[in-house]
């Protein structure tokens, strides 16, 4: 997700201010009109941040009165392990004023973010669990350490989760909702991914605790700001429950490149949450997608049952690991099941194995490296400059 490209009247002002990291927008139909994410420089104090917000509010109100603008101004503030930012709905004059504040690092357009699943294939076999626990293909038995993620909290940042589904009985709670007022999974995507990372039947980390964080609507879309707000909530919740270092976060979603999105997931990882993300489903280089392009997180591409790159899967040097993503059976809202394909399905396999490793004492900082070290070098035609390592849980099988 690129940052805003201001019209020419702003360029002189931008050049005059401290050469901040102000990124130019690469265009695209996913831009949310007049909606922006403003990221502050490192080291900005609470007092400076609050003063900036007050100044922005006053400027916005003045410009609104002058021009009859219908923009709503500042919306939400974020503080993810010291990374301070906010989003809002501003006119161009207010954005010009924001850019002239030397406490501001950069500004981005807010953009649409979507889930990374593809199609439903009825009655497809479930094969992913057996594949990630064996060096050789074709084994349906899932072999795993008995700790199975016990004591680890996994945040499913998605379309919500059906918290009444028997797959999650006694291990799940609703967290927060940044997209609407409906605390259910009207899409099914979030329930499916949760079933893979921690479901009793279809899951990898079968004893992990689960938190539903809804950032995408029933239609499968949301905003970068809404995703960041959800991540901010996860870090705050984990800190309040003394779960940092014992938590994982799954992001089976994405959009075009966003430095703000990448910064947010990086700070969450640095705070002590293992972050797994989907590479994306456009058969393109994942470095142009966020949060997949954040180097600090574990980016998952999708493989097929015969150890090939899924035709839809993004690729590239930013990909850390392949994981099963084609025709994956998992939970569906209402107590049922469904089969989906996508890098959305690969990411929760990685998240679940990562959570299991955390339960075994591997540190958050080392989980992704460990996965890459022990992964099976079996993926055929993985893509240009892309790893051929397939996720493996270290079962010894």
UniProtKB/Swiss-Prot annotation:
Residues 126-397 form the Peptidase S8 domain. The lineage of its organism: Eukaryota, Fungi, Dikarya, Ascomycota, Pezizomycotina. Glycans are attached at residues 250, 393. Gene3D superfamilies: Peptidase S8 propeptide/proteinase inhibitor I9, Peptidase S8/S53 domain. InterPro entries: PCSK9_ProteinaseK-like (IPR034193), Peptidase_S8/S53_dom (IPR000209), Peptidase_S8/S53_dom_sf (IPR036852), Peptidase_S8_Ser-AS (IPR023828), Peptidase_S8_subtilisin-like (IPR050131), Peptidase_S8_subtilisin-rel (IPR015500), S8pro/Inhibitor_I9 (IPR010259), S8pro/Inhibitor_I9_sf (IPR037045). GO terms for molecular function: serine-type endopeptidase activity. This is Subtilisin-like protease 3. It is found in: Secreted. Belongs to the peptidase S8 family. PROSITE patterns: SUBTILASE, SUBTILASE_SER. Residues 1-19 form the signal peptide.
